[in-house]
Amino acid sequence: MSIETVREITEWLKDYRSDQVTITFHGGEPLLAGADFYRQALPILSEGLAHLAPTFALQSNLWRLTPELAQILAQYDIPVGSSIDGPEEINDLQRGKGYFKKTMRGYEIARANGLEVRFICTFTSRSVEHKEEIFNFFLRNGFPLKLHPALPSLRNENPKEWALEPEAYGELLVYLLDKYLENLGRIEIMNINDLCKCVFTRHGTVCTYVDCMGTTLAVGPDGSIYPCYRFVGMPEYVMGNVYDRPTPEDLARSDAGKLMQAFKDYVDRECGGCPHIKYCRGGCPYNAIAPTGGEIQGVDPHCVAYKRIFDEINDRVNEELYGSPVMETEDFGSPLRRKAKPGIMWILQTMATK
């Protein structure tokens, strides 16, 4: 992406909406842009969009991180997301030999320069068999854990070779919920935090579980606008271009915008009787639409997994509140009530105190 396009993005966003904006540098590999790009782009965006209180994030494998780049990013308190799938042997089996060492080398540079790095772990049909080893790796190293399930490839002759089946994903989430509760205070599992918050607030808290249309957009290198970063590079999902200064209404009128609205309408119709609809919203539109060539044939295929973990959390909350001992507490001078094992409310309490 050129600096000219960065300026055009800034001008477009100035009047697009009045909400606070978060800008994530994604790829490909965004560090390939180099230090000079960020040295110019970050002031343009932060000053030009000051009225929107912009914050920034970056997603990278960290291979190209240098002390110079790290220092530039640290000036803007940019958190970095990277990918590690567990111990070196498991990670490199999935991502290629040498990946682990290169990423950890970048991680050490980030740490030395005050950058916060959080790792995303992709669980596949193979690595899920080593879930305890992977969990212990994150626990032992003090890494917060965020996970993704491997999806069927759109570019492979054997698309499901590595894909994690929805049923297995649901059981993995329940397993990690249990492991989290066994190790509260020693590790943070971000997905579990988000899922518990969804249930408690009755509203989705991350893009997978909300109506993301119109609020989570991506801009390609040429200024093309997409519904989200996962659609970048797919011409049929271009909604407009920043050079044309489209309004939210303009984007909604595009073919891709109409498809996103059609998915939302489908969810309202097909999921109306689901107890989780308010904080699930049919899951991720990309997961539902991209594998079918743009045809709406169902909701996110991980619906089974989402129902499994949402049911589990709801059942446990109800049990904690109405059918089991409460957390140890003082009640206006009364004796301490019987101590309960840590549960969902402990997770919520931990989040609230941060």
Regions picked out by a protein language model, each given a short descriptive name:
Residues 28-29:
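Active-site neighborhood of divalent metal-dependent phosphoester/pyrophosphate hydrolases
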